[in-house]
C-alpha cells in the first residue's frame, strides 16, 4: 500500500472537513449561522425486524426513525440566542403556571445544514431537517475559574425527518 493509493481512494475530491459548516434555522434569524458552534448531521436509522422460520432468522427492514439533533450555541451577553430557543420551546409547551401549548404547525420549523469545501464557498453537502422543535434548552455554566473562553449551551431538538 502506498500513499498514492490512499489519495486515489478519494478521487471525488479532498477529505471533508468537520469545521467547515453552517447551520441555518431561519426562524432564529440570520445571526444564528454565526452563533452555532458545533453540531452533527443527525442519524437516520432503519430498524431491523427479525423473522424466524424453523431454526433460522433473517432480518428485514423495519421503520425508519430519526434520533434527536443537538447543536452547541455560543451565548451572547444579552442572552438573545438562548432566549430565542426558550421562546420557541414555549410555543410547544408554555413555561410557568399556565398550561399552554401550540399546534405542531406553529412550533415545528426547518433547518438547513451545509458543509463546505476548503474554499469555504463551495457547498459539498446540504441537508434539510424538517419538523424541528427544541426539547431541551441546556444549562448555562457559570464558573469563576472560566477565563478566556466563550459561554456555550446545548440545545436538543426533536425532528420528523431529514433529506
Swiss-Prot record:
GO biological process terms, semicolon-separated: symbiont genome ejection through host cell envelope, contractile tail mechanism
Keywords, in A-Z order: Late protein, Viral contractile tail ejection system, Viral genome ejection through host cell envelope, Viral penetration into host cytoplasm, Viral tail protein, Viral tail tube protein, Virion, Virus entry into host cell
Subcellular location: Virion
Pfam families per UniProt: Phage_T4_gp19
GO molecular function, one term: structural molecule activity
Keyword match RNA-binding: no
Domain of life: Viruses
A single GO cellular-component term on record: virus tail, tube
Keyword Metal-binding on entry: no
Assembly notes: Homohexamer. The tube is composed of gp19 hexameric rings. Interacts with gp54.
Family the entry assigns: Belongs to the T4-like viruses Gp19 protein family.
Function: Forms the central cylindrical rigid tube, which is surrounded by the outer contractile sheath assembled from gp18 subunits. The tail tube first 2 annuli are formed by gp48 and gp54, which are in continuation of the spike complex. During infection, contraction of the sheath drives the central tube through the host outer membrane, creating a channel for DNA ejection from the capsid into the host cell.
Name assigned to this protein: Tail tube protein gp19
Organism the protein comes from: Enterobacteria phage T4 (Bacteriophage T4)
Source lineage: Viruses, Duplodnaviria, Heunggongvirae, Uroviricota, Caudoviricetes
